[in-house]
């Protein structure tokens, strides 16, 4: 241990900020690096859940991960140098909460609701986001309470707005409440989703909507949206059919007092009369696939047989040698083959051909694409209708054009019923959901393969961001099957209608036939019939992470002052693709300024670095070598090895008395 003091600031107190704090405490507990360590944690929301997982949001908003596969704690699977400090998964914590209660939950004002949810929660249940927030609050409290005696944690319920300091000197962080945290030896940005400015197109539509007296709700977390202006019975357009759509669907039905009941084996919606009339659509025109019922337990996952560590290392060597990878030719064939092999293995297993499954899988993985694969499927009597078809799965309606909304609704109800049936078959036993779950299980491998510009810029933009990422979301990170059942019930009740593929929305002035006044007018490219007119349009999606349009004052300040820049990916012929991600180095993720210099005392990981890293919004899973926890440990250990920074020449060294202490 060296004598002296170290002062660190973590900006963002959600799951990533909590992980960094916990890793600092765990490493200091194992071997103290200093006489005293002070960690400032800055977030205007309560530390632990942060804003996204706050405990006062609607109980109708669910996670899309089962309770046993959610954690905030390290385990032996995490590849890291620091010590393991085990803790309960969300499910294990909920069991203890139901049995013994919690002072933190008791203080929430919603104790009875949380205790009832915890008591009913199973390992494969989907918890409310608010309950996860309670879990994170307790994890933060426990981390602070068990911190080594020489580690002091100071929380600041404010927003960071500016960061200054040369690379050779202590850093100064300014908060919105006027507090200046000086003498910082390191600053870690651990932010999640941050607010964004409107795109030019969004701003034009918002401005025109206001001028016409229409309600246009821009992309946002549904928990943050005020829906009080939406009147019972009025037509509401929702643009988007992903997870955000299902949140709005729940808030505008269950949140308005409606109920779902089982009747004759089917789910039926009992309206309250306070619901609006919902019309939803998107470019694809169908909702995300339901998640298959979990058969993998807490830690199970598909282990790659093609996209292995050895394969990724070989691809990386090519990248180091100057040969940029192309997602469509270097990675997609491996991903597709893995998915297809799992599908056929489950299909043959469901037919009772268990003894021949391994031989088939080995032969299929070795077969070149095309005729050899089809010959093998013929040999195993896999009928053409049973064969995997990426086009059919991604566009289940094919080239069909529907006569009208009734025609499309009938088709959609059949499609959704099949999706529910497939989901009930499970993510191991059910061929379709077992295959789609491979996409989720391969995220870590894909992330390792593509991160830090290893894929050529144009391919990253077009093949990965433009094509595969939305396809992956549609197929593998959808809602619980209960949400699809609810959607069916709402369609059958008439509360919800889906417009179909190729949704288009414009603003038109009213006509005598439409009752006068301006309205949003929605149509579908593939569904005939009259357009839908509404005075409310909800953009049912989150803003895309893009620091060039960030409304976060700290990130905007760093960008405006040249202390940060967007991440560039080298492309073909000397070009580069400018992403919306915050540029950082490889692990431990030092922030890079406008001149390309890495700052030795500033670090960042999380959603703002999307494009440097792929799919940064994924959560922390136990037992599968969580990238977030490994990153947090590397960040913590790097910070703890830093030499204390000298104060700027024009500013005296900070004293402990300078710091506000608002431990919550």
State where each predicted segment sits.
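Flavin (primarily FAD) cofactor-binding/catalytic cores of flavoenzymes
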Residues: 1-57, 106-110, 115-643, 650, ...
């Amino acid at each position: 241990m060296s004598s002296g003091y170290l002062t660190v600031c973590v900006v963002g107190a959600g799951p990533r900020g909590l992980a960094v704090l916990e890793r600092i405490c765990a490493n200091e507990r194992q071997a103290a690096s200093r006489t005293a360590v002070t960690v400032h944690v800055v977030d205007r929301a309560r530390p632990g859940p942060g804003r996204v997982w706050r405990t006062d949001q609607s109980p109708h908003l669910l996670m899309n991960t089962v309770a046993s596969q959610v954690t905030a704690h390290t385990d032996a699977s995490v590849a890291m140098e620091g010590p393991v400090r085990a803790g309960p998964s969300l499910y294990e914590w909920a069991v203890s909460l139901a049995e013994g209660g919690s002072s933190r939950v008791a203080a929430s004002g919603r104790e009875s609701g949380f205790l009832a949810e915890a008591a009913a929660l199973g390992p494969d249940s989907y918890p409310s986001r608010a309950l996860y927030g309670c879990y994170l609050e307790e994890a933060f409290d426990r981390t602070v309470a068990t911190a080594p005696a020489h580690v002091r944690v100071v929380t600041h319920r404010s927003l960071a707005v500016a960061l200054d300091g040369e690379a050779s000197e202590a850093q100064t962080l300014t908060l919105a409440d006027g507090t200046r945290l000086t003498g910082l030896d390191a600053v870690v940005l651990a932010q999640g989703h941050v607010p964004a400015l409107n795109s030019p197109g969004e701003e034009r539509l918002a401005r025109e909507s206001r001028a016409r007296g229409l309600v246009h709700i821009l992309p946002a977390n549904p928990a943050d949206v005020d829906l009080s202006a939406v009147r019972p019975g009025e037509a509401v357009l929702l643009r988007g059919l992903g997870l955000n759509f299902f949140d709005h669907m729940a808030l505008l039905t269950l949140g308005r007092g409606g109920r779902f009941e089982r009747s004759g084996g089917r789910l039926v919606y009992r309206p309250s009369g306070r619901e609006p009339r919902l019309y939803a659509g998107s470019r694809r025109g169908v909702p995300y696939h339901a998640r298959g019922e979990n058969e993998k337990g807490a830690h199970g996952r598909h282990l790659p047989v093609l996209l292995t560590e050895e394969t990724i290392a070989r691809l990386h060597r090519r990248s180091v040698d100057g040969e940029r990878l192309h997602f469509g030719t270097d990675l997609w064939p491996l991903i597709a083959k893995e998915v297809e092999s799992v599908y056929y293995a489950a299909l043959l297993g469901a037919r009772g051909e268990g003894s021949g499954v391994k031989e088939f899988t080995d032969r299929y993985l070795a077969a070149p694409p095309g005729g050899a694969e089809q010959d093998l499927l013929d040999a195993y009597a896999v009928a053409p209708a049973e064969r995997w078809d990426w086009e059919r799965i991604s566009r289940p309606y094919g080239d069909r054009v529907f006569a009208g909304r009734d025609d499309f609704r009938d088709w959609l109800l059949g499609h959704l019923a099949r999706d529910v049936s497939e989901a009930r078959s499970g993510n191991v036993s059910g061929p379709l959901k077992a295959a789609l779950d491979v996409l989720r299980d391969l995220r870590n491998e894909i992330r390792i393969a593509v991160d830090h510009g290893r894929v050529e810029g144009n391919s990253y933009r077009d093949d990965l961001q433009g094509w595969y990422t939305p396809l992956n979301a549609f197929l593998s990170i959808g809602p619980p099957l209960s949400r699809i059942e609810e959607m069916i019930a709402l369609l059958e009740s008439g509360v919800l209608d889906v417009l179909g593929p190729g949704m288009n929305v414009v603003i038109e002035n009213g006509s005598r036939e439409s009752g006068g006044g301006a309205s949003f007018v929605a149509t579908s490219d593939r569904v005939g019939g009259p357009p839908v007119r509404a005075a409310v349009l909800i953009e049912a999606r989150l803003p895309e992470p893009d620091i060039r349009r960030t409304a976060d004052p700290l990130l905007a300040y760093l960008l405006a002052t040249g202390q940060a820049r967007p991440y560039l990916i080298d492309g073909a012929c000397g070009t580069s693709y400018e992403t919306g991600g915050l540029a950082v180095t490889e692990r431990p993720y030092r922030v890079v300024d406008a001149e390309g210099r890495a700052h030795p005392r500033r670090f960042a990981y999380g959603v703002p670095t999307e494009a440097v890293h792929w799919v940064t919004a994924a959560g922390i899973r136990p037992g599968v070598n969580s990238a977030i926890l490994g990153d947090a440990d590397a960040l913590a250990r790097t910070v703890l090895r830093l030499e204390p920074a000298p104060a700027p020449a024009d500013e005296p060294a900070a004293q402990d008395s300078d710091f506000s202490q608002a431990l919550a």
